[in-house]
């Protein structure tokens, strides 16, 4: 029997669970308990407040949705790891601390890198996986040398310029997205520290380094059904990486969204939610 919980993400209370490694992980939970939970893993230098309420509420309409802060990010304790593999280990520890053995997992940007790592190293943990705006280890144009934590000093400009294209329609969607992020009036998350963002930047740069052999070998070990969602004009993670994921994963389908950059799922929320819910309910 599904147990009703909080119905909107903007009102979801923050909670903390202590993982086996002693780290206190901050999380929020919204939707109906009962079936396989959907866990959302966020992008670079983002905390729980940076999830689009429109997306979370749409996904939580008929399922249990969980967001969380990575180690050392936002309200979570510990020191932010400097590799994606270490982040993945901590995420698995968080899931175990909640008593979860199998989940659906949506990874956005950095979260998609973490998702691939967990799907490969702990395949029993994931039933289905959604990868938004991300790329494979050693992907094309994924050195992230153009990224700087100094850009975080102007988050509005950063989001409008990197998550949305210059078109009028995309920029309008960007401003609507920013308005939605400000809906939460109380119990806001702790801002991300620059030291934590710097460690996270080292992690994604390490992920983007091209290995000396077997560039996409890890993808062949991932067998969970996967939905790949990408903006056709993504300037953060080039869209060619979505096609590489589709070609190398064992069971993948690609949703490429037009006139969209890194925040494609928020710009085309209706299309994204329809496809994501159909995929998760399959």
Where is each model-derived feature located?
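Catalytic active-site module of serine/aspartate enzymes centered on a nucleophile-bearing elbow/loop
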Residues: 251-282
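Conserved HGGG/HGGXW glycine-rich cap/lid loop of the alpha/beta-hydrolase fold
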Residues: 20-77
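Conserved alpha/beta-hydrolase "acid-adjacent" motif
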Residues: 235-241
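Flexible "cap/lid" loop of the alpha/beta hydrolase fold
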Residues: 116, 120, 127-158
